[in-house]
From Swiss-Prot:
Organism: Aspergillus niger (strain ATCC MYA-4892 / CBS 513.88 / FGSC A1513)
Disulfide bonding pattern of the chain: none
Name of the protein: Protein pxr1
Domain of life from the UniProt record: Eukaryota
One GO CC term, this protein: nucleolus
UniProt keyword annotations, A-Z: Nucleus, Ribosome biogenesis, rRNA processing
Gene assigned in the entry: pxr1
GO biological process assignments: rRNA processing
Amino acid sequence: MGLAAPRKKIKISHDPNNTNWSRSTSGFGHKILSSQGWTPGSFLGARNAAHAEMFTAASASHIKVVLKDDTLGLGARPKRDPLNEPTGLDAFKGLLGRLNGKSDADLQVEQQKRDNVKLARYAATKWQAVTFISGGLLAQEKTTPIVTEEPQGIHKDKQEDKLSATVPGPDSDGVEGSDNIGGQSDQSIKKKKSKSKNHREKKDRKRKHTEEPESTDSGNTNKRSTEKKSKATRDDEESSSTTSKGLSRERRPMGRHVFRGRHIAQKKAALMDEKSLNEIFMVKS
């Protein structure tokens, strides 16, 4: 408070330590405790408690208040000298050891122990103690092989190759093998024959087109050549598309990409529509 604050007169009582209150026997606390079986000098709580052995003479005395005038936490101790011993005590202990008849080797061992204790105390006060906790040993995790699902077209081709390997050729004399093979092998052979026929027909068509004589009209020849090239490219694209469909999978958008794709598609549709553009730009049609 400053000088402008109201003046307060404080009178020092005759009992500054408040000993009259602690020694009085007419108070409410003393009466209720004595009614519960407490007597002056005894401890509070059950006498047959598990922690009764931990009580000392200080437990029966009055509670003492310590003024906290620092910013340390509760229970923290102020800084003290780590050695906390009078100077020259080590030399005095060594002198007493020599007088008692101890050898120099024993005195050096004791001095080394004292030095180690001093260093440990200094390190504990200077730096926080580090405790290492073992976190176990590093071990290699078991790698589970990833099973990739093959497309149906490749799987069927492999089965057909296996069946064709077991089927004997037309020139071979093995009649028993043809009897053992079921209807599946016959179907696979028919499919292979049809594929080979189609391939041969395509090659024959190409040869015929190349062996035809050149026509007199240059425009007709150019048209025919372009048509041939377009047919060949179409056939190649169809064959490549059939193989690529079997091998590659459709990449479907997942998560937020689905909503983003829809939003972009709606924007494109709105830009392509004249009515929506007029509504956006507030133009009367």
